[in-house]
């Protein structure tokens, strides 16, 4: 266990473990920030005393959860661990670049924390819109540090994306076509393509913001012929694909978990699932301005972005109904990963429906920047991405560690978490419809009831997080070893035992294609 093993590792399993530990730690930081938000909003009146500090917390909560929790766990953690095992590759295509992708994240996190510690912090929201993010409204180094943090996280993700694209296309056995790789591998491939195409645009946007702030350029300043709306277009051209980047690996995970615990050899409609993911990836790039319905776009532009956004519901529906068809007629095993997966399907669908509501530009004019939007994206993230992470973790934990989690405790944990997140976010739909705006630390008394309910829900979720830590400790303390694994011929990641040896597939895998 020399320190060099972890600092200089080129092993996909070790780097995957580093990502998972880092993501879990960041997840606790992000959860702490969210509890500060809910504490402030638990009753009318001021707790933190200052709107600036409140908005710094909101901004940090978003960045930590997106760039340091969901992406490192889903793409870096499970992607690194499972993709090489699932395609029979000895490691990633570029093992040292893989190491660099991980080690860019801690410095990036450090810069984000530093941005909160200098001056007044970056209270811009995660969108970092100018002129609020300009050098008048946010004098000092805070926003600059945030921009540098995003640059590092972006470089990390771009390198990781190159690595995953090369690995999934190039490292599988020659006899295997791309259409014979598991759906999780496909989901990571599509995610990587989205990252590769969208992140450079974000980098351009925040670099121009950096020069506007420090070098007197006027890209986003009307005084010099610039336009703040340009920044919004650049940001959301990245920002919308980003939300699909966050959920697509989750889609892949849910496909695996649902098929496994339905006793099926494969998910229903494999090709439909693959094409649906590719369609979602493509459509995700041509709908960005639905985040900007309130900036004064032409009616025909609004009509296009409304329609295009609604089209995304079709491939998404293909996936949801394919999961239901996979369940159909199966021998259902009611184990904890299946509970998380079923919770995912139900709650992600609810979040998708509120998304369809918001895609209507006329309705969005009213609902934009209210808690209805917050409720919508937390249903697809806090109950989509996070439920997928939990499903993956309890399903693959025996593979990663060789130990099994306590089945009763994990089920109780699921129940507590399910109640907590729903109690937190369902009332926010009511607040949004009643007109409560986002990003304010105080509110009129009329909104008190549902805010209090929401804050109680956040405390229940906190209990669930603490329970999860206990469950983790219990598993490592009890050391129940894995006895046998079912369905290994269609779930090849399990073939090497639990946990697999440090090096797998050191010789090229022999693949025999069975012709019908």
From Swiss-Prot:
Record-annotated disulphide pairs: none
Membrane-spanning intervals of the chain: 12-40, 51-86, 95-117, 141-170, 183-212, 228-261, 270-286, 299-327, 336-357, 371-400, 407-433, 447-478
Binding site for Fe(II)-heme a: 61, 378
GO BP terms: electron transport coupled proton transport; mitochondrial electron transport, cytochrome c to oxygen; response to cadmium ion; response to methylmercury
Requisite cofactors: heme; Cu cation
Role description: Component of the cytochrome c oxidase, the last enzyme in the mitochondrial electron transport chain which drives oxidative phosphorylation. The respiratory chain contains 3 multisubunit complexes succinate dehydrogenase (complex II, CII), ubiquinol-cytochrome c oxidoreductase (cytochrome b-c1 complex, complex III, CIII) and cytochrome c oxidase (complex IV, CIV), that cooperate to transfer electrons derived from NADH and succinate to molecular oxygen, creating an electrochemical gradient over the inner membrane that drives transmembrane transport and the ATP synthase.
Name by which UniProt lists this protein: Cytochrome c oxidase subunit 1
Source organism of this protein record: Carassius auratus
Lineage: Eukaryota, Metazoa, Chordata, Craniata, Vertebrata
């Amino acid at each position: 266990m020399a320190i060099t093993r972890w600092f200089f590792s080129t092993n996909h399993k070790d780097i995957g473990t580093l990502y998972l530990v880092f993501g879990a730690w960041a997840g606790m930081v992000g959860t702490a920030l969210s509890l500060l938000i809910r504490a402030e909003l638990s009753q009318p009146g001021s707790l933190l005393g200052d709107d600036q500090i409140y908005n710094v917390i909101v901004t940090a909560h978003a960045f930590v959860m997106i760039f340091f929790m969901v992406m490192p766990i889903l793409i870096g953690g499970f992607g690194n661990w499972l993709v090489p095992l699932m395609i029979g590759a000895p490691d990633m295509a570029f093992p040292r670049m893989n190491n660099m992708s991980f080690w860019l994240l801690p410095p990036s996190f450090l810069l984000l924390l530093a941005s909160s510690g200098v001056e007044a912090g970056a209270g811009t929201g995660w969108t970092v819109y100018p002129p609020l993010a300009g050098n008048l409204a946010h004098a000092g180094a805070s926003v600059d540090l945030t921009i540098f943090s995003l640059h590092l996280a972006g470089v990390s993700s771009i390198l990781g994306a190159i690595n995953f694209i090369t690995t999934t296309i190039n490292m599988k056995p020659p006899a295997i076509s791309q259409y014979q790789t598991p759906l999780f591998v496909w989901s990571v491939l599509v995610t990587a393509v989205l990252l590769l195409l969208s992140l450079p645009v974000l980098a351009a946007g925040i670099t121009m913001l950096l020069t506007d702030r420090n070098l007197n350029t006027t890209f986003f300043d009307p005084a010099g012929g610039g336009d703040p709306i340009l920044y919004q277009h650049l940001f959301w051209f990245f920002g919308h694909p980003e939300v699909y980047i966050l959920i697509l690996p989750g889609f892949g995970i849910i496909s695996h978990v649902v098929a496994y615990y339905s006793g099926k050899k494969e998910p229903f409609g494999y090709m439909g699932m693959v094409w649906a993911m590719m369609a979602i990836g493509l459509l995700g790039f041509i709908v960005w301005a639905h985040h900007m319905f309130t900036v004064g776009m032409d009616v025909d532009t609004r009509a296009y972005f409304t329609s295009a956004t609604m089209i995304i519901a079709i491939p998404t529906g293909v996936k949801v109904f394919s999961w239901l068809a996979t369940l159909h007629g199966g021998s259902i095993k009611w184990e904890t990963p299946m509970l998380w997966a079923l919770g995912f399907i139900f709650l992600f669908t609810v979040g998708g429906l509120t998304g369809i509501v918001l895609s209507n530009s006329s309705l969005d004019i009213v609902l934009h920047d209210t808690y209805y939007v917050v409720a919508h994206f937390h249903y697809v993230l806090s109950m989509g991405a996070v439920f997928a992470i939990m499903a993956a973790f309890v399903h693959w934990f025996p593979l990663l560690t060789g130990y099994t989690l306590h089945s009763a405790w994990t089920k109780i944990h699921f129940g507590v978490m399910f109640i907590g997140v729903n109690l937190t976010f369902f009332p926010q739909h009511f607040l949004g419809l009643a007109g409560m705006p986002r990003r304010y630390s105080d509110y009129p008394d009329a909104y008190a009831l549902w805010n209090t309910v929401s804050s109680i829900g956040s405390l229940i979720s906190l209990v669930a997080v603490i329970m999860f830590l206990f469950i983790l400790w219990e598993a490592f303390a009890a050391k129940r070893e894995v006895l046998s694994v079912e369905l290994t011929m269609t779930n090849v990641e399990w073939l090497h035992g639990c946990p697999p040896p440090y090096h797998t597939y050191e010789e090229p895998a022999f693949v025999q294609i069975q012709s019908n």
